[in-house]
């Protein structure tokens, strides 16, 4: 099969990359009613599959799970999760023929096999749903022309999708209709109802395209969301230990530092994160971030180029065909790094200490977020999409590192994200080693002393931070989420 994106002409490619519209609340006035009374069958019961299903059932929809015969016979984890939560479970042959909407929430590498199994069983005029468009865009899966193909992509892990719903809210969500598969013109109605059923309409929904979702998602997860955090963790730990820091303290400063730093990012963007620093430290973090951006820009651009061209996907799919040899080797090597095997620190590190002693880490976050955003926008992706795939998701990924270091991050993210993470981090670590060798006291592991600063310089730095495009669009989107949360709680 041909990569779908590469079959489009340039005008079509740019149009799909640039498709992004923030949808109004009034567009979801009907909630999930379009799907009520219809049969929704979810294939796969992982984190997204289970939690989306729970939300959709609580929204009044008829939800069941189609699993492989062997998963049912052997009572695998997917079968246990579905049955323990009171869902009807059956084989593909038992459930798919009656389904009005089949939602494929299996891992990317299983999509082709799943779609080839369920397509012949789907009734005429049914709909097929995805939460990530890799199978359509990168694999180029051909879907029967009578089938409507839609996407609802929550911009959070499945557990977060459920927790926010239970609080009466939701998570930001992208929705799309595949232009090659909307025979009855009902794709948008299906996608809107599905998004409303998961609670996404309460946090903000972007009408996007399969292409824009895939290309921006791949770029974000490879660079700032996973690759930069992994490279930064390994580099910072080794630097601290080489300069005499207790390995246990160094490990904790990094493991929990990312989460603490990005919590400020979540609440107030790069501006608030930088405002947590003293004035001298802020100036230094800004200078370091500018150096990092200059060094890393070609690497970010290479990843974006390889994503756009399909080079990344073809390489990863070749590894799938080779039993994940590269992926499993990189995973094993990561598990043996000094950071992953360091002892745990039993003492306490105060919240402000993470900022004061993590100036370099803050610079890495700032540089990575801005570079990912800028590179996506330069490639034709709209700012709102670029924001959600860079700054917005970073605190969620940082939280996984706080749980069980890089191991947990790589377990939680998809195999696609993990593969891209390793590609980036394996290139980034040697790239930044000369930069790490030139660091000054106070950049990492110790605080920069208070001292006089040049007012004009501080003014210019503050202006530069606040005027960046990601801060402008981020302020708007975070404000919308706060407004929606207040409305949801009041309701």
Curated annotation (Swiss-Prot):
Q: Where is the KARI N-terminal Rossmann domain?
A: 15-208
Q: Does the keyword Magnesium apply?
A: yes
Q: Give the binding site residues for Mg(2+) 1.
A: 217, 221
The function of this protein is: Involved in the biosynthesis of branched-chain amino acids (BCAA). Catalyzes an alkyl-migration followed by a ketol-acid reduction of (S)-2-acetolactate (S2AL) to yield (R)-2,3-dihydroxy-isovalerate. In the isomerase reaction, S2AL is rearranged via a Mg-dependent methyl migration to produce 3-hydroxy-3-methyl-2-ketobutyrate (HMKB). In the reductase reaction, this 2-ketoacid undergoes a metal-dependent reduction by NADPH to yield (R)-2,3-dihydroxy-isovalerate.
Q: Which residues form the KARI C-terminal knotted domain?
A: 209-344, 345-484
Q: Which cofactor does it need?
A: Mg(2+)
UniProt binding sites for substrate: 414
Identify the residues that bind Mg(2+) 2.
217, 389, 393
| Family per record | Belongs to the ketol-acid reductoisomerase family.
Q: Gene of origin?
A: ilvC
EC numbers, comma separated: 1.1.1.86
Tell me what this protein is called: Ketol-acid reductoisomerase (NADP(+))
Q: What pathway or pathways are given for this protein in its record?
A: Amino-acid biosynthesis; L-isoleucine biosynthesis; L-isoleucine from 2-oxobutanoate: step 2/4; Amino-acid biosynthesis; L-valine biosynthesis; L-valine from pyruvate: step 2/4
Q: Which residues form the active site?
A: 132
InterPro entries given in the database record = 6-PGluconate_DH-like_C_sf, 6PGD_dom2, KARI, KARI_C, KARI_N, NAD(P)-bd_dom_sf
One CC-aspect GO term: cytosol
Catalyses which reaction?
(2R)-2,3-dihydroxy-3-methylbutanoate + NADP(+) = (2S)-2-acetolactate + NADPH + H(+); (2R,3R)-2,3-dihydroxy-3-methylpentanoate + NADP(+) = (S)-2-ethyl-2-hydroxy-3-oxobutanoate + NADPH + H(+)
């Amino acid at each position: 099969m041909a990569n779908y994106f590469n079959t489009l002409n340039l005008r079509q490619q740019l149009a799909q990359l640039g498709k992004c519209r923030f949808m109004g609340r009034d567009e979801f006035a009907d909630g999930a009613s379009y799907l009520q009374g219809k049969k929704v069958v979810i294939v796969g019961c992982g984190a997204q599959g289970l939690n989306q299903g729970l939300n959709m059932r609580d929204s009044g929809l008829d939800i069941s799970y189609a699993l492989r015969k062997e998963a049912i016979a052997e009572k695998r984890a997917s079968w246990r999760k579905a049955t323990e939560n009171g869902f009807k479970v059956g084989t593909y042959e038992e459930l798919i023929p009656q389904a009005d909407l089949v939602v494929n929430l299996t891992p990317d590498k299983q999509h082709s096999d799943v779609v080839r199994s369920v397509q012949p069983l789907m009734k005429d005029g049914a709909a097929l749903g995805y939460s990530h468009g890799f199978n359509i865009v990168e694999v180029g899966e051909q879907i029967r022309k009578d089938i409507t193909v839609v996407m609802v992509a929550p911009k959070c892990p499945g557990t977060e999708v459920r927790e926010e719903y239970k609080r009466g809210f939701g998570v930001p969500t992208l929705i799309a209709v595949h232009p090659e598969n909307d025979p009855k013109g009902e794709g948008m109605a299906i996608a809107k109802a599905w998004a409303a059923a998961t609670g996404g309409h309460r946090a903000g929904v972007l009408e996007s395209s399969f292409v824009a979702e895939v290309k921006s998602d791949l770029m974000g997860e490879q660079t700032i969301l996973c690759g930069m955090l992994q490279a930064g963790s390994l580099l910072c730990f080794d630097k601290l230990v080489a300069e005499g820091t207790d390995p246990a303290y160094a490990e904790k400063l990094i493991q929990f530092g990312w989460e603490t730093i990005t919590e400020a990012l979540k609440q107030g963007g790069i501006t608030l994160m930088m405002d947590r620093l003293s004035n001298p430290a802020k100036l230094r973090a800004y200078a370091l971030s500018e150096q990092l951006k200059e060094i890393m820009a070609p690497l970010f651009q290479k990843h974006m180029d390889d994503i756009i061209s399909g080079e990344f996907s073809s390489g990863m799919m070749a590894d799938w065909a080779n039993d994940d040899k590269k992926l499993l080797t990189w995973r094993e090597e990561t598990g043996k790094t000094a950071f992953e095997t360091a002892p745990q620190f039993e003492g306490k590190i105060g919240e402000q200490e993470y900022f004061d002693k993590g100036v370099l880490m803050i610079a890495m976050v700032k540089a990575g977020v801005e570079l990912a955003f800028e590179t996506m926008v330069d490639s034709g992706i709209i700012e709102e999409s670029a924001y959600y795939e860079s700054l917005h998701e970073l605190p969620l990924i940082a939280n996984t590192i706080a749980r069980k270091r890089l191991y947990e991050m790589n377990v939680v993210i998809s195999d696609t994200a993990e593969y891209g993470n390793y590609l980036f981090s394996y290139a980034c670590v040697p790239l930044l080693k000369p930069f790490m060798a030139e660091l000054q006291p106070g950049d990492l592991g110790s605080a920069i002393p208070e001292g006089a600063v040049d007012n004009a310089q501080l003014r210019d730095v503050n202006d530069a931070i606040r005027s960046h495009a990601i801060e402008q669009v981020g302020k708007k989107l975070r404000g919308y989420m706060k407004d929606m949360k207040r409305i949801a709680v009041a309701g």
